[in-house]
Amino acid sequence: GLGDVYKRQSIDNVIINDIFFYDEGFKRNSNEVRTPNGNGSYGWGIRILNLSDSGNLENLTIKNSIIENISHSGIRVKGRLDNKFKNVNIFNNKLFKTGGPGMVFNSTYNLHAYANDINFSGSPDDSRKWGRGSGLWTWGSTLGLIEKNKFQNANGPADSAGCHIDFNCKDIVVQHNLSKNNAGGFVEILGNNYNCSYRYNVSINDGYRIKGKGNNFQEGKSFWLSGFVGNGNERHGPYNSYVYNNTIYVNEDVVSKIAVDKNSKGVLVANNIFYYKGETAMVLGDQYKPDTGGDGSIENVFFENNLFLKDHWPKEVLIQPSKSVIGDPFFKNAGGELISDYFPLNIDLIKDKGIDITNIVNDSIGLRIGLKVDMDILGNPIKNMPDLGAIEIN
């Protein structure tokens, strides 16, 4: 009934495929993919939303399921911003060729999304599909742990990162994931987000999209802090973003683009390996209300102790590295498909060369889950000082 709280819903071991609203051959208007979520009718995989004024769901689990060939989102969970779904556990699911995002978590509190395999989100292989979508994204959510997932081959003219943190979130941690070949990019944190983090992930060839090519209206970006908080609203944030111990590899035929909004406040970037073989470029954030650029200085920045293949972080970006290490980590198999291909063989350059991560200046919170990490992306214990990148040399 109205105002009731329903506890413990579980979806387990379900197979969902070929879900379309229209018959084969239906073609969507080319502007449809430019709207924030699509305005037309679609088939969805699992869609859970709160249409009540005061009712709610708690302890929601979706696990061990396969969702394939859907015209929009694979899994979309949508609570209310003022009455969030509580305790959402999504694990061990396989999502393949969804026309929209793989998973969307809107207005959740205490989300754990782990060990999911999301491939070809935003798939354009059927004209009935939306053709845009990140592997996973959150909006209006607080306390989220997104870990041990694979985000691969996200496609679309905008967004379509491996995993992005949309606006109005707090305490979302993205860790121990593989992010590979996603058009939109790797790190994407939007506005009005507080204390969010990407740590101990491996990113391979993310952010290759070129604005203006085909239908693309956003640049792909390797690293993007965006103050966007919705159409027509004044940009602000993100606040206190922690990006550390990631291994980021981009091959020579991709320009690695970086966008940092001047409204960002509090940024920590440390212990990462930025292996950009090709060119790099500063670009402006390009959502529906674009970043106007211009001078600005971002307060409370700690951008130190990162390894770069070359000294080519773009000079126009409003955050600039210091105390960097320049060198080649000698990955076991640079350009490979697997996390283990990015095991660094240059031990002297990497081992115990990380620094302990501490709170950003004027941030009393850090990360609620804790800044210290016990294991690397492969499950190796972190001993002594942390190493550089996502893989600990034991």
Please annotate each region the language model reported.
Residues 2-3, 346:
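Activation loop
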Residues 322-393:
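C-terminal accessory segments
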